[in-house]
Amino acid sequence: LKEIMEQPDALRHAIAPRLRGGEIVFDDLKLTPEKIRGFDRIFIVACGSSYHVGMVGKYNLEHLLRRNVEVALASEFRYRDPIVDDKTLVIIISQSGETLDTMAALREAKKRGAYILSIVNVVGSSIARESDDVLYTWAGPEIAVATTKAYSTQLAVLDMVGLCFAKILGTVREEEYADTVRELALLPDKVKET
């Protein structure tokens, strides 16, 4: 129950520092607009609850980016000979940043030339260190087995990535972008009300 009640603050920590003047700003992202425009394949790779974040996030990313997004279980990704090269963006999602299957999938994708963008909670984790780029969720420790704030913050950050990239690609209407950014800013308070 404690961690459920911490969700509004966790979402605020994940969202607020990245919203400025009605824009999504990722100060810590090294990806350039040119590199983003060059991706022709996008994978979301994760395990457990993070995989389910990817399944939900896929729909929003496809809507915003007008590109196919494939979601893969990390434990299966490296065994299926995925079509991955230097024009592939692989988004790794992990709460701990230490999940072994996810680490193995990251290494396989990187070996094939993919650009790795990770969404993780634990600063300085193995996945964060081995990624080309990392966005932290800043959800804080999560002790309960049933995920709450980690799931919420991962999904919020993934949605922000989609919105930011869509603006760069020109695949989102200005009105939809502005409305969604406004809704993101209100999300922590809306969660608190429920």
Predicted features along the sequence, with ranges:
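Cofactor-/ligand-binding subdomain signature composed of acidic, glycine-rich
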Residues: 1-39, 160-194
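Glycine-rich phosphate-binding loops that contact phosphosugars or nucleotide phosphates
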Residues: 37-186
